[in-house]
Amino acid sequence: MHSTLYDQMHALAQTHPERAAIIEPDRRVNFKQLFDQSNRLAAHFKQQGMLPGDRLALWLPNGIEWVQCLLAAAQIGVTVLSVNTRFRSHEVQDVIERGGAKWLVFWPDFKGIAFREILADVPASVLALLKGQFTRDDLMTFVDQPIANVAAHTDHGVLTFTTSGTTALPKFVLHTQSGLLRHSEAVAHAFAYDDKTCVLASAPFCGAFGFATLSGALFNGHSVVCEAISDASSLRELIRTQAVTHTYANNALILQVLRIADQREDFEHCRLFGFASFAPALSELFDEAAANGVPLTGLYGSSELQALQAAQPVDPALGDVSVLHQPGGRLIPEDARVRARDPETSHLLGNGQSGEIEILTPSRMAGYLDQPDAAHRAFTDDGYYRTGDLGWCISDRQFVFQARMGDALRLGGFLVNPAEIEQVVEELPGVEAAQVVAGHWQQKNVPVAFVVLSPNATPAPDHWLSDCRRRLANFKAPVHFEVLEAFPTVQSANSVKIQKHRLREMAQAILDTKS
């Protein structure tokens, strides 16, 4: 594996020239074409004034042009600020101002979104910070125009992911070319990619989850299938027609794809579907997967460590397969290690004890862009990343993720995974979905349940409470049930995330008025 994207893609263009690199529903590009087109794009970018050290805001959906821009930027020595296509003027302004973007690439007509109108809402003084803007049509013109190649830049911080910023300003998580390539190689090895591998990338490339899906295949010479706009039906069709072997997606999307399958043969080439638990627990996912003959495994990752950082093993020789369907996993890089720490005493914990998960991995970020102090605080003195996640270790290579530490509940002197209570609440009559948080009441922490009702259901809090007390330890039974039309959310690159901090504020306000 080379240390720069240019060298790696150049090698693949020589060894796999005719193999499809990126496959879209109505077009495709092979490895030689992708390499040549990215070279031309880099030369045109440089001709337009793009310089090493500049930052490029990449505001495109999944597709060939997204990949071309990344490779071109890497060749010049530019840092790509990946921008979610769902972003609006406030977020775009933040990318330009705090992210220091000097160039912007966007697709004005994508998905019926008025990108030019969104930009018009960004203050003129902020847009003036840009050296230039390019549309998708500009890119398509550039890659077809012959031009002299430019020299390839050395390894540098080439790509940032934006954290979701549910409780603070988003951070720009920076990764180097060599770090991305090293992790991609580990992913390809861990999932046993071979000459027949074809990976479906449904999550946005702008997020760590989608990018790791892309890079693990593409940078190792395997085909990647993607589309700019996806739904369960279109993804099912791509899986069937493109002989997809692997895909990694959120659990809700995988369930939708499996539900609409016409026959098991739709998935005859599939070797593994990896799922991340972005949605509340979906037990029917495993039944649908079994009915369709699709192997499933739980995943784990983050922007700081890269996604597909861990996957539960399917082979008993590699770890405990009894937790196959739980998030977390066996660490993908062979030299990565995991441990758990008590968040209150700071003592390291033994296997099976819940605490904050800490991970040591070569896939770690280079830092937070322009925030060295924040990056320093993210790691222990011996290099482990403080994930902020609650979980327990099976070994120093495998663990189970339970919840975000901020979401974990300290009840009755114990750390409690809210999903344990939520599962019980969601089985109550009339409850469609539940979120449980803790608040302070009568000198102790107590759980509060927020619920969304099933259609035509009527709230029954007294019955719900007695049922919970029958099925759970008393300290886990919610002291209050609050009915909402919908949970407060924030959009991230991979999913819509429920704002637990907002629910905690609401819960405390309720408890403050409770006798």
Label each residue range with its predicted role.
Residues Q47-Q48, Q75-D144, A148, P455-A457:
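Structural core segment of the AMP-binding/adenylate-forming
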Residues F87-D94, L104-P108, T247, T361, ...:
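AMP-binding/adenylate-forming catalytic core of the ANL superfamily
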Residues V244-A249, L258-S322, R337:
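Gly/Ser/Thr-rich phosphate-binding loop
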Residues R330-R337, T345-A378, V416:
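Conserved ATP/PPi-binding loop(s) of AMP-dependent carboxylate-activating enzymes
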Residues H2, H10, E18-G49, D54-G63, ...:
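Conserved AMP-binding/adenylate-forming core of the ANL superfamily
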Residues N30-K32, V158-R182:
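Conserved AMP-binding A3 loop
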Residues L181-C198, C206-H246, I260-A261:
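Conserved AMP-binding/adenylation subdomain of ANL enzymes
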Residues L409, Q435-H440, V448-F450, L465-S515:
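Conserved C-terminal "lid"/linker of ANL adenylate-forming enzymes
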